[in-house]
Structure formats: structure tokens, C-alpha cells
């Protein structure tokens, strides 16, 4: 036995040199099965991935024949053996595996289970990390092979020789220029996270932006409510041309001391009571034009009208606020200032109505939106004494849903338009409650003959 043969027998199986095969033969890599080497067509894969994979197989054949000097029979035996060992010892991978990988695709460097496309090659996590660390820390100049660079690299032997493993990474096509240093890697990771967050925001905005618009049934309901409002709204859209300003001297001379420190100008109060009766009548007519309202018992109709009348009249006045003259137009005909309305009997309630008018001026409400607001106020199921509470609540829900869908259809440019508009319902309910309290005091302070009968009928309990 020669010294060389004795030395060779002492080497591990993976470090033994093999006879040089016929260079014209195409040889397989150790550790890769027939199924892996003869994969199905990659037509369904990305074009770039197909080209890279084809290149990788050509490089593998060159590596096997020129570097490893393997015997063809040896290669076949080791391939089958390694594949069987791999299948026996394989553990189920619970990590993320990209969809572009074939089932059980193997690393082109060591034959372990691949986890993705890393640095232009399909590799396992181990070879990806080894290649990255080698480049980032410039370790390859310090690598050396004890066996003249002829080591076989598979998933068992890959940690035995760093030089041969790195050489194989290069030969199969792993790109050194794609490895980033720590600062660039952190910057890339930050950019990826920012892009993910951006996509999340865009998807959220897209889902929020997709808002339903009225159905055919809701359009019919909207049409009915709008027509009811237009038919009972004095002067319609021509109110500015037809309004008359209350003389400035009226409402400036308080005569009666009202509760809570307020003062009442009886002349102004007399003017307001003259227009209050037709204003109440129009609210009643509006309600009677709604089929849902007419289906309710008469007792419930009366309770709903008494509860919402001041709220609807206040809304109709508020949407006719004129910022230029700083006035509200009552019943479509009488323009009054804040002071005149306050001294005319409403006191602090007038401030709430004017403030509402100022805030609504930026909403640019159309007749349909005003009409639907009135319908929501009318169908308030929490009025004391109602019998058909559930039915009224159902009616209000129908109006609210149609209202919201109509707002989506209108596409207002005010931020959070719908919730802000719903808050105005709360403001109007507060105005109604404050007016009820104010009315009780006014009955005591003002002469009874100044109150119109319909006014007393609606606002008295």
C-alpha cells in the first residue's frame, strides 16, 4: 500500500478524492435527487426565475465535473442515498416558503430544503446566511481548504470547509453585489416596513373609500322626503330675495324681565308670534306627507310632532343663516339679528340657534339633506309616552341608512362629514329641550293673549 493510499484511507468519506470522470459527461450534484434534477417545466414561473435556475443547473454540472472529479456510478449512488437520508430525516418546515418554489425544492449549494430566492439563487437559510456573513465581514480571504479545494458540499459536509462552500456559492451564481452592509440592510428593512405600512394605509383608505350609495328603494324614500320638505318650506331657494328685515329699533327695548336674567321686548315677541303659527303648520304638513308617519297611531303622531316641532323650525331657520348680514330668516320671510331673537323671547336659545346656523353654513346642505335631517328628528323613538316605539325606531333607522348612503353619493369634501352632521341632531335636540324650559317661564312672564292657540297647543304638556 502506498503512502498516498494510506493517507486517503484516513480521510473522511466526503474528503476522499475521486477518479477524474469523462469530462464529456453531464454529472449530477451529490445530495440532489432525480426529481430535483429533472424538475417539471417552469412555464408558470417568473421569466427571470426560469433563466436564473437554468443557469444554476449548468454551473452545477461544470462544478461537479471540473472541481469534484466524481465517478458517475459513485455520483448516482450518493445521490440516491443522500436523497433517501434527506427524506427520512426531514422535519416539517413551519416557516414561510414562497409560492414560486416547487414542492420540496432543494438548495443549489448544499441540497438542503430551499427557503427562497437569495442573492439570485434558490438556497436554504444556512447557505444564505453563510454567504451574507462572508461578504459582509470579508471573511473569504481567510478561508482555506485542507484538501486542495476538492471538497464535496452537501447538507452534511457544508460546515467542514468554508472555502469550498464559498466557491460553490459563487459557482452556482450567488451575487456578491447584492449583499448589503449593516447600515444598508437596516435602511432596506426600514424601507420595506415603510412600504408595507403604506400599502396597509392605501388598502384601508380603499376599503373606507368604498362607501355604498342609495339603493333603488332608498332613492324612493329620499325622493318622498325631499318632496315633502320642498312643498312645505316657505319661499324655497328664493328666501334671500323675498325676506324682510325686522326694523333695527324692534327688539332693542326690553320691557318685561324674563327669568335667568333675560329680557323680553314685547313688540319683537308680538312679531315672532305672528309667524310662528304658519311655521308650525308647515312642520305638521311635512310630517303628514310621509307615509311612515301616517301609518302610526294618532296619539303617537301628536307626541312626535310636539317633540320635534321646535327642533325642525330651528333647523329651517339655521340653514338660512346669512353670514354677510349676520341674520337668520324665520319662516322664509323675516330676517332677524341675534339680539332681536334673544330679546324677542328666546333668550339663550337664540344663541344656540345662531351658533348652529354659523356651523351649518360650511356644510352646504341641499334640500334633500335638510329634509332627511328633519325626518330623523321627527322619528325619535325616545319621546315620552309613545306606544309604537320599535316601529318608530325602525323608521328612523331607515331614514338614517338612506341619509348616510345619500351623503356618500354627494361626496362632500368636509372631513368626517357624516359624523359631524349627526352631531347636529344632538344640538337640535338640545335646542328643543332648552326651548321647552324657556317656554314654561315665558308663560308666566308674558301676557297670555300674546300666545297663539296653536303655539300653546304644541308646546304645552
From Swiss-Prot:
It holds the Pfam family zf-C4. Its main location: nucleus. Residues 217-461 form the NR LBD domain. 3,3',5-triiodo-L-thyronine binds at residues 282, 331. GO terms for molecular function: chromatin binding; chromatin DNA binding; double-stranded DNA binding; enzyme binding; identical protein binding; nuclear receptor activity; RNA polymerase II cis-regulatory region sequence-specific DNA binding; sequence-specific double-stranded DNA binding. Residues 13-24 have a biased composition (Basic and acidic residues). Zn(2+) 2 binds at residues 145, 151, 161, 164. SMART domains: HOLI (SM00430), ZnF_C4 (SM00399). GO terms for biological process: animal organ morphogenesis; cell differentiation; cellular response to thyroid hormone stimulus; embryonic organ development; female courtship behavior; mRNA transcription by RNA polymerase II; negative regulation of DNA-templated transcription; negative regulation of female receptivity. Signal peptide: none annotated. L-thyroxine binds at residues 282, 331, 435. It is found in: Nucleus. Belongs to the nuclear hormone receptor family. NR1 subfamily. This is Thyroid hormone receptor beta. The lineage of its organism: Eukaryota, Metazoa, Chordata, Craniata, Vertebrata.
Amino acid at each position: 500500500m502506498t503512502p498516498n493510499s494510506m493517507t486517503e484511507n484516513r480521510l473522511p468519506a466526503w474528503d476522499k478524492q475521486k477518479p477524474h470522470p469523462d469530462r464529456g459527461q453531464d454529472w449530477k450534484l451529490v445530495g440532489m435527487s432525480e426529481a430535483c434534477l429533472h424538475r417539471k417545466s417552469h412555464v408558470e414561473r417568473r421569466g427571470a426565475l426560469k433563466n436564473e435556475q437554468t443557469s444554476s443547473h449548468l454551473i452545477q454540472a461544470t462544478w461537479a465535473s471540473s472541481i469534484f472529479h466524481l465517478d458517475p456510478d459513485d455520483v448516482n449512488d450518493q445521490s440516491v442515498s443522500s436523497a433517501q437520508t434527506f427524506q427520512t430525516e426531514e422535519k416539517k418546515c413551519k416557516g414561510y416558503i414562497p409560492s414560486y418554489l416547487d414542492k420540496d425544492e432543494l438548495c443549489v449549494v448544499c441540497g438542503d430544503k430551499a427557503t427562497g430566492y437569495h442573492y439570485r439563487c434558490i438556497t436554504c437559510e444556512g447557505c444564505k446566511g453563510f454567504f451574507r456573513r462572508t461578504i459582509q465581514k470579508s471573511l473569504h480571504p481567510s478561508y482555506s481548504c485542507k484538501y486542495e479545494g476538492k471538497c464535496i458540499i452537501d447538507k452534511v459536509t457544508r460546515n467542514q470547509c468554508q472555502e469550498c462552500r464559498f466557491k460553490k456559492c459563487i459557482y452556482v451564481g450567488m451575487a456578491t453585489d447584492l449583499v448589503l452592509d449593516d447600515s444598508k440592510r437596516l435602511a432596506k428593512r426600514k424601507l420595506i416596513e415603510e412600504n408595507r405600512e403604506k400599502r396597509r394605509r392605501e388598502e384601508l383608505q380603499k376599503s373606507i373609500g368604498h362607501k355604498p350609495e342609495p339603493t333603488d328603494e332608498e332613492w324612493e324614500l329620499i325622493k318622498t322626503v325631499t318632496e315633502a320638505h320642498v312643498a312645505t318650506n316657505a319661499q324655497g331657494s328664493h328666501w334671500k330675495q323675498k325676506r324682510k328685515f325686522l326694523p333695527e329699533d324692534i327688539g332693542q327695548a326690553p320691557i318685561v324681565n324674563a327669568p335667568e336674567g333675560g329680557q323680553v321686548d314685547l313688540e319683537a315677541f308680538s312679531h315672532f308670534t305672528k309667524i310662528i303659527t304658519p311655521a308650525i303648520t308647515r312642520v305638521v304638513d311635512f310630517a303628514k306627507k310621509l307615509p311612515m308617519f301616517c301609518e302610526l297611531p294618532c296619539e303617537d303622531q301628536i307626541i312626535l310632532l310636539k317633540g320635534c316641532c321646535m327642533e325642525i323650525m330651528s333647523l329651517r331657520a339655521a340653514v338660512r343663516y346669512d353670514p354677510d348680514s349676520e341674520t337668520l330668516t324665520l319662516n322664509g320671510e323675516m330676517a332677524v339679528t341675534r339680539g332681536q331673537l334673544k330679546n324677542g323671547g328666546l333668550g339663550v336659545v337664540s344663541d344656540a340657534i345662531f351658533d348652529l346656523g354659523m356651523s351649518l353654513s360650511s356644510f352646504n346642505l341641499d334640500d334633500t339633506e335638510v329634509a332627511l335631517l328633519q325626518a330623523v328628528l321627527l322619528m325619535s323613538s325616545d319621546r315620552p309616552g309613545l306606544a309604537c316605539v320599535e316601529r318608530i325606531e325602525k323608521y328612523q333607522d331607515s331614514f338614517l341608512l338612506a341619509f348616510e348612503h345619500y351623503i356618500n353619493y354627494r361626496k362632500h369634501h368636509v372631513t368626517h362629514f357624516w359624523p359631524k352632521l349627526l352631531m347636529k341632531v344632538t344640538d337640535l335636540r338640545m335646542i328643543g329641550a332648552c326651548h321647552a324650559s324657556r317656554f314654561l317661564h315665558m308663560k308666566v312672564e308674558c301676557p297670555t293673549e300674546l300666545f297663539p292657540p296653536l303655539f300653546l297647543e304644541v308646546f304645552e304638556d
